[in-house]
């Protein structure tokens, strides 16, 4: 049986830090002495982008706001399965998606990457999408969780949201897996 505690204890502090940063935008660092491989990631809200070394083409699915508007969990799971298959074909370990932020502001320039303004719908769709991707032994990495409503100064902006709104609206979709 694999002993994660033993492995963590064998890692040096520098090795632990290196696992938190990454080799580049698409690969994690590897630790050869402990047989820890690099993990390959890929982005794309509606397709498996791959990396610049891949010459394989990508399928382009409708953007998440379009598939979210179907309210069809079975269809969205099939999209997830297809994305998982394509990711596997490109040797991708982790698909960076889905994006689960809610549409909270009409000027949100990346809302097309999100499923909906409705937290319950977003949560249920995200669960189906993730189950589809992960059925192909590819990890799905949820991103843009809460209060990511603007592209203006996106790396430094402060999204100030009161606790009541966070609990009543912004966090609701994060509990969708509890109500299968």
Residue ranges and their predicted role:
Residues 176-180:
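A short, hydrophobic C-terminal helix/tail in secreted or cell-surface proteins
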Residues 1-175:
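Glycoside hydrolase catalytic-domain context in secreted enzymes
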């Amino acid at each position: 049986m694999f002993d994660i505690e033993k492995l963590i204890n064998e890692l040096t502090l520098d090795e632990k830090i290196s696992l938190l940063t990454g080799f580049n935008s698409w690969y994690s660092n590897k630790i050869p002495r402990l047989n820890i491989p690099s993990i390959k990631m890929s982005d794309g809200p509606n397709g498996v982008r791959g990396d610049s070394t891949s010459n394989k083409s990508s399928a382009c699915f409708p953007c998440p706001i379009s598939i979210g508007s179907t309210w069809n969990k079975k269809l969205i799971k099939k999209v997830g399965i297809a994305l998982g298959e394509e990711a596997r074909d490109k040797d991708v370990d982790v698909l960076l998606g889905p994006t689960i932020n809610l549409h909270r502001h009409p000027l949100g320039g990346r809302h097309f990457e999100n499923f909906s303004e409705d937290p319950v719908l977003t949560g249920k769709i995200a669960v189906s999408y993730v189950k589809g991707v992960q059925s192909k032994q590819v990890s799905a990495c949820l991103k843009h969780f809460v209060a990511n409503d603007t592209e203006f100064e996106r790396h430094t902006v402060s999204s100030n949201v009161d606790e009541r709104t966070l609990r009543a609206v912004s966090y609701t979709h994060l509990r969708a897996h509890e109500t299968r």
